[in-house]
């Protein structure tokens, strides 16, 4: 009897946790499900929802977007920001929507969550899509800093800024922030030649309802580094194991995404192969906006 009540308590706790999450679905629930996992820590799914979620659903998918616990619209003062916490919330989404399998679409940091979840629960995943996703964090940080050292080789002030970041603890929120702040200041996340379509998508998003809820929890990275030991990882060996386990992996990246080196991209492409890899022209980190038509077309061809 005691074990029965303990089981009941655990089940209740499991589902109660999921209720704190912001979750929104798009499309017909009978279609193939895709769960979108946003970047971060401190991110949210508003840009994806405000520009792309419904259009992806219109391709014949059941799209589920959510904000991770403690991030965006999923406020939770007790959030731990660990991968395990993210896994349990993903499992609660599977339960809530009665999903046996789903495609996991991970963007940026969400790609790490997606990869680690797929490795732990391969039977839950019908396909893993990495979209501008992180996979070798230290190589990304090194690439950002080395690129900028070359760019500013004759600028002592800029070199000093870079050196300060370079000498921080590489397993700290400050180091991560420093690298990405420098990348942002130098246009690493911007497409070089915005198109009429991308300009409209960004402007409509900024004028719309989703932008108003673009909530950023600035404490999220600090708590992630405090609570999560796997805070500077390389998932390529894990991706090989996922592929060997029979889960299809698809990768789509922007040619102008400044946070990845050519060597990184080539190493990733070698894992999945030519037919499961797409490299989009005139496209940076937010590829589902920068080149939305090509992004949607690739996903439809791969997943339908």
What name fits each language-model region?
Residues 41-52:
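The serine-hydrolase catalytic nucleophile loop
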Residues 46, 68-83, 139:
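Glycine-rich "HGGG/HGxG" loop immediately N-terminal to the catalytic nucleophile
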Residues 57-73:
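Conserved alpha/beta-hydrolase
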Residues 87-102:
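Conserved acidic catalytic loop of the alpha/beta-hydrolase fold
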Residues 100-143:
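Conserved hydrolase catalytic core segment
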Residues 128-171:
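Flexible "cap/lid" loop of the alpha/beta hydrolase fold
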Residues 245, 251-253:
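Short beta-strand/loop motif that positions the catalytic acidic residue
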Residues 283-292:
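Catalytic histidine-centered segment of alpha/beta-hydrolase-like enzymes
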